[in-house]
């Protein structure tokens, strides 16, 4: 094996720990630097990571010891950091969404193409046993020709558990850009590309109340829609209805269901790598769980 691929991490919020722990055990990857707009975060994180330097964001983006920038900033900064990395000849992999707006996403992709560097974006959970087992079942004809599908993500809002949830309710946030990528990536993986979209959205509350951490009880403004419903028309002709909401308390709906001519497939939470894939065939009397047949755990 050659030299380890060198990664610099920008953004040291809640999600960064999962990435740092995973990369620490990967023999082909080495984290060489961390940075955050809040310098105290990088100064506190770096000492716990052997061989990792705490840098400013600009220092990390231009560092000769970084091959790929792992962009874990809040959504509103995704495009800015990605463009900075690309401008210094770095590959960039970021948390979802790729950018806060479609125009910014196009700008990032165009800049990367000109620079000859790679751009990647979460989610990678689509490679797990949940979605991959479902895809294998569809390919095997377990439900016949897919006719329509549904996707549902309902939560009262991340402010209940996240100590600094402001970004969920500003540009680049909201349920569709925050959680929707897991569902949309899986739907495209299972049913193919989408050629047309219809949607509607609403904003039911002007404020949210933080429910944990040092800011408990603080009210934050809601600047984006918190409920989004849509219909996706896949190229193959399948129709998918999708609901993503920060306004519902709970749901009994499967995260994703695909209905075919001879059966229905229930797909587990696409925000996870695993989970049971269940099949109800025409003439069956109950659901049955399919054994994992593909993907990574």
Identify what each model region corresponds to:
Residues 1-49:
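N-terminal Rossmann-like dinucleotide-binding module
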Residues 185-276:
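Contiguous beta-strand/loop segments that form the cofactor/metal-binding neighborhood of enzyme cores
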Residues 29-31, 66, 146, 194:
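Core-facing hydrophobic residues within beta-strands of well-ordered domains
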Residues 67-68, 74-75, 79-126, 141:
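Beta-strand-loop-alpha-helix segment that lines the small-molecule cofactor/substrate pocket
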Residues 256, 266, 273, 283-297:
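C-terminal helical cap and adjacent loop that interface with cofactors, partners, or active-site loops
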Residues 51-59:
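Conserved SAM-binding strand-loop segment of SAM-dependent methyltransferases
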Residues 93-94, 119-121, 150, 242, ...:
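Hydrophobic residues in well-ordered beta-strands that form the structural core
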Residues 125-220:
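Predominantly a Rossmann-like dinucleotide-binding segment in NAD(P)-dependent oxidoreductases
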């Amino acid at each position: 094996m050659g030299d380890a691929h060198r990664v610099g991490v920008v953004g040291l919020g809640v999600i960064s720990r999962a990435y740092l722990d995973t990369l620490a055990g990967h023999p082909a990857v080495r984290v060489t630097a961390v940075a955050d707009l809040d310098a105290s975060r990088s100064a506190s994180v770096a000492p716990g990571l052997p061989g990792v330097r705490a840098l400013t964001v600009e220092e990390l983006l231009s560092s000769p010891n970084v091959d790929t920038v792992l962009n874990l900033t809040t959504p509103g900064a995704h495009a800015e950091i990605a463009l900075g990395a690309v401008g210094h000849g770095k590959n960039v992999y970021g948390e979802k969404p790729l950018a806060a707006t479609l125009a910014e996403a196009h700008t990032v992709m165009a800049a990367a193409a000109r620079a000859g560097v790679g751009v990647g974006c979460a989610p990678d959970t689509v490679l797990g046993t949940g979605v991959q087992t479902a895809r294998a079942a569809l390919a095997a004809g377990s439900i016949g020709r897919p006719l329509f599908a549904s996707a549902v993500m309902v939560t009262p809002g991340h402010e209940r558990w996240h100590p600094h949830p402001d970004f969920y309710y500003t540009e680049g946030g909201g349920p569709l850009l925050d959680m929707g990528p897991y569902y949309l990536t899986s739907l495209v993986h299972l049913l193919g590309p989408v050629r047309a979209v219809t949607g509607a959205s609403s904003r039911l509350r002007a404020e949210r109340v933080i429910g944990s951490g040092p800011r408990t009880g603080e009210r934050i403004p809601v600047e984006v829609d918190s409920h989004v419903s849509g219909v996706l028309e896949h190229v193959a002709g399948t129709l998918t209805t999708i609901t993503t909401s920060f306004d519902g308390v709970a749901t009994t709906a499967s995260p994703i269901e695909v209905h075919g001519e001879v059966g229905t497939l229930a797909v587990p939470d696409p925000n996870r790598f695993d989970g049971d894939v269940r099949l109800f065939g025409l003439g069956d009397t109950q659901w049955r769980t399919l054994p994992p047949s593909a993907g990574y755990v």
